[in-house]
């Protein structure tokens, strides 16, 4: 009801909302002209010789005028908000669910033209500590994990999906049924990999800890040295779990740090040496002093997201990046000791990819500055934190602030581990049941329409046409194993026969999670095929699509949707078009725009300079905005290219919506009649950004470049959301 509320405020008075049914009830309750005259005759019967009195004339005239005025007001309301009797209201179960979502989301006390993000998202932000996309992911994970928890699994002869289910069950059981045997298994593992925490010892070996953890578990708390399968370069990268370590530490240090001190004490009692105090055991204050040097530098380096990597590096290159802190002989010894003949081909031929070079360099610079024993102590401390979550309930709960958060976050931990070690098998049964042929056809149509919108919108542009054509061309016949074609290859890949063949080397899973992890890692290295699945969470953000590396024969990259993109809160085949194109359609458009701009960034300097020097609205509107009376919100939080990419994707999604709805006409949602189809698309497009760290800028900034938004919500010149420059 944004425009209606804005109109009411401009008139400085309130008015009741009158829908079609309410209007009919009101008209039925009013006396008609015939009934009025009849009533008047019965109440005041005139003499046969008398004419109607002047008062009667005036009453009849007033009544007629009143009815006409009421009708005029109603017609005005319908015309003003675009509500016509020919636009029906959708009251299906799906529509009612989206209507309920809007009631929970929209803050009608905020004018859309003042701050659209706050209008759509402020209620969400006030009620949730996570983003809307994370909310969709949590709903998806809840359904998938519950399905796997209830799956009956035989002891032997397990299918691929049953192996994934048993793996998940063995992990989640540690929080509900774990005991001393699980704790003892973790302690034994710590000794095997050389973790001496809580001792500070010169016998510690940083490379041994890193390589042994990576080789046994393909997991590490800070930095991971990973070899997934034979003849594949080692990948060195920051650990995904390290983000969790940083966030949990920050939370526990809040309010004076007593929670962190208490947690340290708990871990010391559980994992400390039984013989009593020793000189080489650090106190809590010494840990804090050490972390004051380590954590800020590692956290800054961890924040580097992209563009900082080295491929096909030799061992000598890696040693040089590490500042020659550790001699080459030690590196070679750890390669030989931890990676067997299936993987290890000798250091002369070993190739390494270093993701996030800054983090790698920072890690070894800190080790050089503080000493190997201190870095090994910190590695041990973070390792204990991670592995303690696979022990028993009372130890696991130490890590979390409440029982409720422990129950929820431990599920997410186990989901992440199962995803990492079993890939698509964890989601396969859910996909086979939920992703019906109707869904596949509908999503394929959605993709085709958005592709067509890009080509149609930029076909006449000599600058953009080539980039758009390459990014929207149909895939080659061998580009995907999926008969539906990208971006739904996960549907084909989740077939049980395909998964059973892919995971044939995986052993039957049992109730011991650490044993299952080691078995999965060994099996992964025994196959030449990649059993991994793209991560749902990347750099702390839930993603609904990912990009597939460009093949040698491919003209450009392609993208794939992830199963979470079809979660009902985000997508339904029965949803109104504005919901489809505002949510999933816009995400597809984001992916295509990402391909376009990645292609632009990879172009040669002359091409890139030629494009950026053109008087293109999408590239220069942000600059123009700084000269306007109302500068773009968040300027310069989004670079010119980022803003142009975001605006291009919104433009394509919106034009696709107009094409399939004959200009934006669609059924209304119950109790949200004033929201036209165009309005609704912008609402759901912005809703996906609710709660994100940069959500306000990703929502508000591009809208000011799209005249359709200002027209839909009638944003007047001078309002914050008025169109700065028309780019469509």
Segments (PLM) and residue ranges:
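Intrinsically disordered, low-complexity cytosolic terminal tails
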Residues: 1-43
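Helix-loop boundary elements of multi-pass alpha-helical membrane proteins
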Residues: 38-71
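Signal-peptide-cleavage-adjacent N-terminal segments of secreted and extracellular proteins
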Residues: 60-143
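Sequence contexts marking disulfide-bonded cysteines in secreted/extracellular proteins
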Residues: 89-96, 112-114, 120-122, 170-172, ...
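Hydrophobic/aromatic-rich, well-ordered segments within soluble, folded domains that form packed cores
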Residues: 105-126, 250-268, 650
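Short, well-ordered loop/turn elements at secondary-structure boundaries
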Residues: 110-113, 219, 373, 545-547, ...
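Noncatalytic, helix-rich "gating/capping" subdomain that lines the substrate-entry/channel surface
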Residues: 141-463, 485-487, 491-494, 498-509
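Intrinsically disordered, low-complexity linker/terminal regions across diverse proteins
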Residues: 287, 293, 320-321, 325, ...
């Amino acid at each position: 009801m944004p425009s209606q509320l804005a109109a009411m405020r401009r008139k400085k008075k309130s008015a009741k909302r009158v829908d079609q049914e309410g209007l009919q009830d009101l008209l039925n309750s009013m006396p008609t002209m015939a009934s009025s005259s009849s009533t008047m005759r019965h109440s005041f019967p005139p003499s046969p010789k008398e004419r109607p009195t002047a008062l009667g004339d005036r009453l009849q005239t007033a009544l007629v005028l009143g009815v006409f005025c009421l009708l005029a007001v109603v017609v005005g309301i319908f015309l003003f908000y675009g509500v016509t009797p020919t636009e029906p209201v959708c009251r299906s179960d799906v529509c009612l669910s989206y209507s309920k979502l809007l009631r929970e989301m929209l803050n009608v006390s905020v004018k859309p033209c003042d701050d659209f993000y706050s209008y759509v998202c402020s209620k969400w932000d006030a009620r949730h500590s996570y983003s809307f996309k994370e909310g969709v992911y949590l709903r998806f994970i809840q359904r998938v994990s519950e399905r796997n928890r209830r799956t009956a699994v035989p002891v032997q002869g397990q299918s691929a999906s049953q192996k994934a289910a048993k793996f998940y069950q063995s992990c989640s059981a540690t929080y509900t049924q774990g005991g001393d045997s699980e704790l003892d298994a973790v302690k034994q593992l710590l000794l095997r990999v050389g973790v001496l925490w809580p001792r500070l010892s010169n016998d510690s070996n940083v490379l041994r800890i890193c390589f042994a953890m990576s080789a046994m578990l393909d997991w590490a708390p800070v930095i991971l040295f990973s070899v997934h399968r034979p003849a594949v370069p080692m990948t060195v990268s920051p650990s995904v779990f390290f983000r969790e370590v940083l966030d949990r530490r920050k939370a526990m240090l809040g309010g004076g740090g007593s929670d962190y001190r208490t947690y340290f004490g708990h871990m010391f009692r559980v994992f400390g040496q039984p013989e009593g105090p020793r000189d080489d055991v650090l106190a809590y204050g010494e840990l804090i002093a050490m972390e004051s040097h380590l954590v800020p530098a590692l956290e800054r380096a961890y924040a580097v997201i992209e563009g900082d990597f080295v491929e096909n590096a030799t061992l000598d290159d890696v040693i040089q990046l590490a500042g020659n802190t550790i001699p080459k002989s030690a590196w070679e010894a750890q390669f030989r000791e931890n990676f067997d003949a299936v993987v290890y081909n000798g250091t002369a031929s070993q190739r390494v990819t270093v993701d996030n070079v800054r983090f790698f360099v920072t890690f070894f610079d800190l080790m050089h500055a503080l000493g190997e024993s201190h870095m090994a102590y910190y590695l041990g401390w973070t390792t204990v934190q991670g592995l303690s979550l696979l022990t028993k309930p009372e130890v696991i709960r130490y890590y979390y602030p409440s029982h409720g958060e422990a129950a929820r976050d431990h599920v997410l931990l186990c989901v992440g581990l199962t995803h990492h070690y079993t890939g698509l098998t964890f989601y396969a049964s859910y996909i086979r049941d939920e992703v019906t042929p109707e869904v596949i056809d509908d999503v394929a149509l959605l993709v085709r329409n958005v592709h067509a919108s890009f080509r149609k919108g930029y076909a006449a542009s000599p600058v953009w046409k080539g980039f758009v054509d390459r990014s929207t061309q149909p895939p080659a016949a061998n580009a995907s194993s999926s008969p539906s074609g990208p971006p739904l290859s996960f549907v084909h890949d989740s077939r049980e026969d395909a998964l059973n063949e892919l995971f044939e080397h995986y052993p039957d899973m049992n109730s011991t999670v650490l044993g299952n992890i080691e078995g999965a890692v060994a099996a992964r290295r025994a196959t030449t095929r990649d059993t991994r699945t793209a991560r749902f969470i990347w750099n702390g953000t839930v993603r609904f699509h990912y990009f597939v590396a460009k093949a040698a024969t491919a003209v450009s990259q392609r993208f794939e949707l992830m199963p979470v993109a079809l979660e009902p809160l985000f997508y339904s085949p029965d949803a109104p078009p504005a919901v489809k194109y505002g949510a999933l359609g816009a995400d597809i458009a984001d992916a295509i725009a990402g391909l376009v701009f990645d292609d632009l960034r990879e172009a040669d300097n002359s091409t890139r300079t030629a494009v950026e020097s053109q008087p293109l609205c999408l590239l220069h509107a942000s600059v123009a905005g700084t000269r306007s009376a109302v500068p773009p919100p968040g300027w310069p939080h989004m670079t010119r290219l980022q803003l142009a990419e975001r605006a291009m994707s919104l433009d394509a999604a919106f034009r696709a919506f107009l094409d399939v709805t004959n200009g934006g006409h669609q059924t209304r949602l119950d109790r949200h009649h004033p929201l036209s189809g165009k309005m609704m698309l912008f609402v759901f497009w912005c809703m996906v950004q609710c709660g994100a760290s940069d959500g306000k800028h990703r929502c508000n900034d591009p809208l000011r470049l799209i005249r359709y938004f200002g027209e839909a919500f009638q944003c007047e010149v001078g309002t914050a959301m008025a169109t700065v420059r028309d780019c469509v």
